[in-house]
């Protein structure tokens, strides 16, 4: 008798739970910045699971190749959130394999820069998405769009808005919660942007030398100048002639600080620093981070750390 009562109660419970289980949504993000934004937009929503496609230590997706495991994750996705602007070079393959999978492009409406950060990017190609699987997969070409849009907090706000709209379109049953999360997050990002502008407006020196093309959007937004970029793509080896030219450029600029990134080695920076005396600092492009127990303020925390690093690096010590 007890067994029958237990089974009856269990059946009733499953009947009530089954709609919730059936409506569980899987949101897949392409890499870490989009993952951080998605976590904030879906916090507190029990019916949504966030899966990040690239491992949290991957960094930028310059040469990222989809694995069999990635394709299995995408096969279970209800929506795929991407950075866009050319970051996901594999996108055509995803769309061909999963033609019904909604893809939300966070870069929509953002004015893009070229890879060198000097000009606005003009898309003269007749396509809507990344040209995927090219032979020179992920490598730098002058005039290509710079995809590191999230390092301008105003751009981050636009990205969050685009992602929120896409999530609501894909899962309208969560609209109220997503809208509340959007409002809360945009308020925090707006405060971050104002703080960055106010703080960095005061630094007397504006030139920085970076080791990757991650920071042109940051520099444009906050009044800095990327005077030189050492490696257009992380891991590119410099020839002796290229190294000598960089040393000459940096000396001509009165040895501005060199900014490395924690995701990549600083061997070239150390060499240039020895030759010029230029100091070395670290800026984080927020492309890696913890996989579990991720603080919702992780993006803001790293951006404020970058702000403090720049404040120290670009403000002469008293007496200088």
Model feature map: region roles:
Residues 1-5:
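Positively charged n-region of N-terminal signal peptides that target proteins for export
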Residues 8-19:
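Bacterial N-terminal signal peptides
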Residues 24-320:
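Extracytoplasmic metal-acquisition and chelation regions
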Residues 6-9, 101:
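Extracytoplasmic entry segments of secretory-pathway proteins
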């Amino acid at each position: 008798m007890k067994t029958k009562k237990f089974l009856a109660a269990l059946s009733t419970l499953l009947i009530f739970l089954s709609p919730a289980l059936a409506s569980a949504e899987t949101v897949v993000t392409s890499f870490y910045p989009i993952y951080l934004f998605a976590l904030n937009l879906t916090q507190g929503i029990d019916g949504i699971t966030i899966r990040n496609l690239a491992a949290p230590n991957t960094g930028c997706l310059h040469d990222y190749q989809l694995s069999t495991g990635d394709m299995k994750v995408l096969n279970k996705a209800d929506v795929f959130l991407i950075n866009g602007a050319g970051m996901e070079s594999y996108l055509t393959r995803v769309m061909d394999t999963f033609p019904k999978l909604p893809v939300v492009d966070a870069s929509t409406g953002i004015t893009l820069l070229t890879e060198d950060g000097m000009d606005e990017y003009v898309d003269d190609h007749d396509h809507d998405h990344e040209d995927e699987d090219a032979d020179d997969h992920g490598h730098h070409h002058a005039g290509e769009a710079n995809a590191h849009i999230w390092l301008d907090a105003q751009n981050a706000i636009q990205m969050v808005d685009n992602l929120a709209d896409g999530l609501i379109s894909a899962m309208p049953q969560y609209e109220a919660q997503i809208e509340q999360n959007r409002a809360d997050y945009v308020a925090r990002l707006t405060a971050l942007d104002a703080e960055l502008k106010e703080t960095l407006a005061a630094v007397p020196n504006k030139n920085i030398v970076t080791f990757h093309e991650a920071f042109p959007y940051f520099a444009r937004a906050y009044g800095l100048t990327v005077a030189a970029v050492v490696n257009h793509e992380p891991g590119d080896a410099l020839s002796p002639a290229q190294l000598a030219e960089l040393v000459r450029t940096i000396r001509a600029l009165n040895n501005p600080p060199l900014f490395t990134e924690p995701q990549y080695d600083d061997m070239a920076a150390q060499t240039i620093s020895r030759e010029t005396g230029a100091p070395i600092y670290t800026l984080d492009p927020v492309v890696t981070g913890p996989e579990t127990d991720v603080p919702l303020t992780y993006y803001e925390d790293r951006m404020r750390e970058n702000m403090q690093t720049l404040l120290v690096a670009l403000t002469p010590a008293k007496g200088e």
